[in-house]
Swiss-Prot record:
Mg(2+) binds at residues 471, 473, 475. One of its GO terms (cellular component) is DNA-directed RNA polymerase complex. Pfam families: RNA_pol_Rpb1_1, RNA_pol_Rpb1_2, RNA_pol_Rpb1_3. It comes from Synechococcus sp. (strain RCC307). Its cofactor is Mg(2+); Zn(2+). Belongs to the RNA polymerase beta' chain family. RpoC1 subfamily. It is an enzyme of class 2 (transferase). Binds 1 Mg(2+) ion per subunit. PANTHER family: DNA-DIRECTED RNA POLYMERASE, DNA-DIRECTED RNA POLYMERASE SUBUNIT BETA. One of its GO terms (biological process) is DNA-templated transcription. Its EC number is 2.7.7.6. This is DNA-directed RNA polymerase subunit gamma.
């Protein structure tokens, strides 16, 4: 970690999450100011003063602990300006520095009694219960002050280590111990609450237990063996991370930086605050009350009740609703605890740390683009101008259309023809990546050549849908622009849709026509027997070439399923080759005309083909024409 002035740059390879020791928690929050004063402990539940609107000292927003609210200004206003950097005000004790330190400086609350960490107690599995080799129900009875636990049986004959005792049972044993004829010399020791739990965890010698468990595992089987392995795994993890089991019981609680749990003033003079402040306030109030009760030597039952309430307050702060009644705020809304902030899709890890937002990307609904080639996609002009804006601006300046970036942006906003022409030049040969979530295999993200289209929907070739598992009922896809030349080359060589015809999982073709395509091909080439077949030479149904048939169809002179005669000198696949022609006639010039069921050939004297007319439907001509256009490069 390197420091330069006030800026801190951290270089690290990974983040490791493990149990923190009480000393480590204090280190997070405790700081020594330049004048030697130690600060960090939050002792008051107050947040801000309602008259001055400044943070209360030693409270949850204390400027002495967390840093000044305003840049280079202390709490009392004695020091203002950057020239006083690093000075600690003699009057208010606030260090003069930047206000952004309030985003990372922590504090801590020193607890008047230990409390158990709810994650390790009530998590699945319960690590506390596994380590102590006790049922979770029994551990909860101890922590929440329902039962005593024997920490040391002493000379008592019936008591055993870790045995649970109710209030009445312990009173009976006490009477027995302090009776005049008692033979017990070493008194049994019992405990209750998180203090007792901490004592039990401190007694654990992890290395010895691990060795013993390995011996027991070798001689056991079935469910007992599985239980032993589970316990050994937890113990091995504790040994590997140099963590102590008693750290699962907290003596101090870290207070996160105030700017991560802000308090904001609304228009009406009211304040909106983070739920964490309410939860911290509950903990501090109960902690202070417990400390006061202990000072005045209050009855044990009152102190015990306050300890239980402190335990519940800390549980709610760490994970509200995990155990007991959920703490609610206004309108009976559950308060968001630390766990709620970090867990789930909207939590700190998945929302802010793992899933980074990507520049040069967009998202839109997909629609079918039947006229596209397989390696092409239709990109809306509105989206393209935004995604390729830096490239367009660069080219506009290079071509001397504008002089600076500001003028280029104004021109782009007007969407002039010049801009569209430059955009077309930019996207020519620049592949884009289309991704459809969830990306379950590598074909879930493929490269395409963009074609500018009107509207706001991305057009996609129907054949690539199976690879994306996409359909056109409202699916959305994300667009990414590869910027580096290497990325563009990789996209073109490896990720282009026309290069990904086979499934990487099975090796079978994944680009297969289905649904509309199969039905369309069938409908196009189907024949209707009820339609009359024209005689050869019928002017309205005889055409010189395939183009003439297509023109007649476009002009609506014929329909898809009408029979037509069309001149076609290519090979014809039919069943007439082995049969005799229906009619054969020799003309005066020596040529011969043969009439077959679906064709009419004119041959010379040597039997060579001069011309051929075939009887087919308009739809089949259109299909044939489309295939020729696709396959033959003209």
């Amino acid at each position: 970690m390197t420091n330069s002035n006030t800026r801190t740059e951290s270089h690290f390879d990974y983040v490791k999450i493990k149990l923190a020791s009480p000393e480590r928690i204090r280190e997070w929050g405790q700081r020594t100011l330049p004048n030697g004063q130690v600060v960090g402990e939050v002792t008051k539940p107050e947040t801000i003063n309602y008259r001055t609107l400044k943070p209360e000292m030693d409270g949850l927003f204390c400027e002495k602990i967390f840093g000044p609210s305003k840049d280079w200004e202390c709490h009392c206003g004695k020091y203002k300006r950057v020239r006083h950097r690093g000075i600690v005000c003699e009057r208010c004790g606030v260090e003069v520095t930047e206000s952004r330190v309030r985003r990372h400086r922590m504090g801590f609350i020193k607890l008047a009694a230990p409390v158990s960490h709810v994650w390790y107690l009530k998590g699945i599995p319960s690590y506390v219960a596994i380590l102590l080799d006790m049922p979770l129900r029994d551990v909860e009875q101890i922590v929440y002050f329902n039962c005593y636990v024997v920490l040391d049986p002493g000379d008592h004959k019936t008591l055993k280590y870790k045995q649970l005792l109710t209030e009445d049972e312990w009173l009976e044993i006490e009477d027995e111990i302090y009776a005049e004829d008692s033979e017990i010399e070493t008194e049994p020791e019992v405990g209750i609450g998180a203090e007792a739990l901490k004592a039990l965890l401190e007694d654990l010698e992890l290395t010895e237990i691990a060795e013993q468990l390995r011996e027991d595992i070798s001689g056991s089987k079935g469910q007992k063996r599985a239980k032993l392995i589970k316990r050994l795994r937890v113990i091995d993890n504790f040994i590997a991370t140099d963590a102590r089991p008693e750290w699962m019981v907290l003596d101090a609680i870290p207070v996160i930086p105030p700017d991560l749990r802000p308090m904001v003033q609304l228009d009406g003079g009211r304040f909106a605050t983070s739920d964490l402040n309410d939860l911290y306030r509950r903990v501090i109030n109960r902690n202070n009350r417990l400390a006061r009760l202990q000072e005045i030597l209050a009855p044990e039952i009152i102190v015990r009740n306050e300890k239980r309430m402190l335990q519940e307050a800390v549980d709610a702060l760490i994970d509200n609703g995990r155990r007991g009644r959920t703490v609610v705020g206004a309108n009976n809304r559950p308060l968001k605890s630390l766990s709620d902030i970090i867990e789930g899709k909207q939590g700190r890890f998945r929302q802010n740390l793992l899933g980074k937002r990507v520049d040069y990307s967009g998202r839109s609904v997909i629609v079918v683009g039947p006229k596209l080639k397989m390696h092409q996609c239709g990109l809306p002009k509105e989206m393209a101008i935004e995604l390729f804006q830096p490239f367009v601006i660069h080219r506009l300046i290079r071509q001397n259309i504008v002089n600076n970036i500001k003028a280029a942006k104004k021109l782009i906003q007007r969407a002039d023809d010049e801009v569209m022409q430059v955009l077309q030049e930019v996207i020519d040969g620049h592949p884009i990546l289309l991704n459809r979530a969830p990306t379950l295999h590598r074909l879930g993200i493929q490269a395409f050549e963009p074609k500018l289209v009107d509207g706001r929907a991305i057009q996609l070739h129907p054949l690539v849908c199976p690879a994306f598992n996409a359909d056109f009922d409202g699916d959305q896809m994300a667009v990414h622009v590869p910027l580096a030349l290497e990325a563009q080359t990789e996209a073109r060589m490896l990720m282009l849709a026309s290069n990904n015809i086979l499934s990487p999982a099975t090796g079978q073709p994944i680009i297969t026509p289905s649904q509309d395509m199969v039905l369309g091909a069938y409908y196009l080439t189907a024949t209707r027997q009820e339609r009359s077949k024209p005689e050869f030479g019928d002017r309205s149904r005889t055409y010189a070439n395939l183009e003439d048939v297509c023109h007649a169809f476009e002009e609506k002179r014929i329909t898809l399923h009408d029979w037509v005669w069309v001149r076609f000198n290519g090979a014809v696949d039919d069943d007439d080759e082995a049969k005799e022609p229906i009619k054969s006639e020799t003309l005066s010039d020596g040529t011969r005309v043969e009439q077959w069921q679906y064709r009419r050939d004119r041959l010379d004297e040597d039997g060579a083909l001069i011309s051929r007319y075939v009887l087919t439907t308009t739809g089949r001509v259109v299909m044939n024409r489309t295939i020729i256009d696709a396959v033959v490069t003209r």
